[in-house]
Regions:
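Low-complexity, intrinsically disordered regions enriched in charged/polar residues
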Residues: 34, 123, 148, 171, ...
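Extended interaction regions within the primary functional domain
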Residues: 43-45, 88-90, 96, 136, ...
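Generic surface-pattern signal
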Residues: 46, 71, 114, 125, ...
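Short N-terminal helix-initiation segments at or just after the protein's N-terminus
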Residues: 59, 162-175, 193-207, 237-243
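Oxyanion-binding "anion nests"
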Residues: 99-100, 180-227
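Short secondary-structure junctions and interdomain/linker hinges
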Residues: 130-133, 161, 188, 216-223, ...
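Loop-centered beta-sheet repeat module
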Residues: 134-184
Length: 317
């Protein structure tokens, strides 16, 4: 029998995976990738009795391959917070899905493991921009301000490192981050001491954010703003973090960051406003993307559709 752990290469995917495996250890083949590489289940060839755990990637985007695994006799467990579309009725699949706006996969796992090693889930909440929720959870655990800041920085920087057209845009591959996280055991603060990974991410996160806030908006409306950025490694890395920064600094604001791809299409990151955290996923679905009510994206929007996207964005928000 073989085991497979399939998870998004962002903070939510990696840290949720680690928290789960701290409580339920299992040797498994790791399958992960950059944040927008959502079709990860397609890489798994599991057979009868094999166990596949999937975390923080859209069921809607992987349903066909999940069905393939079930048809082959595999046993699947699925943790996620994205819109799943149609679930599969099968005795060999167990779903842990919650699509509420203020939830992360890490928080779903935290509930599943009854709060064991919960600091990892707090970092996922910080990474997914649930700042108030994460801070309140950290305070409830008795953490001081310095520890809370470190948890926030871990969540933000690991999430930041996941964005890129390819792994070449990142400072560390998701596999390298997962290995460093696993080496921490139950102590999340050991991540700050893992070689130079944390310091490198923190320094470059700060540099890229400084570059982003100097950019001029492409479009401004009453309740939203759109930025259009060039095809550079730093723009791909920072787009999600910059999106979260914009909506955090104005809780009535929705935003979209459109970054030019190498094929002249646009990769787009959308955030609904924090005071009305709805609509991002539905907007992106209209253009072949997907996501959650609060945060969503499009991988390849043709330049010819950018104006239509702008109009739909303004109508949605």
């Amino acid at each position: 029998m073989s085991n497979y752990d399939v998870f998004n290469g962002d903070a939510d995917g990696i840290l949720a995976w680690h928290q789960l495996r701290l409580t339920h250890p299992r040797d498994a083949t790791i399958v992960t990738g950059v944040k927008r590489d959502v079709g990860l289940v397609s890489r798994v060839n599991a057979g009868d009795g094999d166990m596949v755990t999937v975390m923080d990637i859209s069921h809607a985007k992987n349903r066909k391959d999940v069905q393939r695994l079930l048809d082959s006799g595999a046993i699947v467990e699925y943790f996620d917070h994205h819109d799943p579309s149609e679930l599969i009725a099968h005795p060999n699949i167990t779903y842990h899905i919650n699509t509420e706006p203020n939830i992360s996969t890490g928080l779903i796992v935290n509930s599943h493991v009854k709060g064991k090693n919960c600091l990892w889930s707090i970092a996922t909440a910080f990474g997914d921009n649930h700042m108030e929720l994460a801070t309140n959870m950290a305070k409830a655990e008795g953490l001081d301000d310095e520890q809370i800041l470190l948890l926030k920085q871990i969540g933000l920087t690991v999430n930041y490192n996941s964005y890129g057209q390819t792994v070449d845009d990142l400072f560390y591959s998701p596999e390298e981050i997962a290995k460093a996280v696993k080496a921490c055991g139950s102590d999340i603060f050991r991540f700050t001491e893992q070689s130079d990974i944390f310091s490198t991410l923190l320094k470059n996160f700060s540099n890229d954010m400084s570059s982003a806030v100097c950019q001029e908006p492409y479009s401004i409306s009453d309740n939203g703003v759109i930025y259009k950025l060039p095809n550079e490694s730093w723009t791909h890395r920072v787009m999600g973090s910059f999106s979260n920064h914009l909506v955090s600094t104005n809780k009535d604001l929705a935003c979209a960051i459109a970054v030019l791809n190498s094929d002249e299409t646009y990769r787009i990151s959308v955030r609904s406003s924090l005071n009305n955290p709805h609509g991002a996923g539905d907007l992106c679905k209209k253009f072949g993307g997907g996501g959650r009510e609060k945060a969503a994206g499009i991988n390849n929007l043709p330049d010819s559709e950018l104006e239509e996207f702008k109009e739909e964005f303004e109508e949605a928000f």
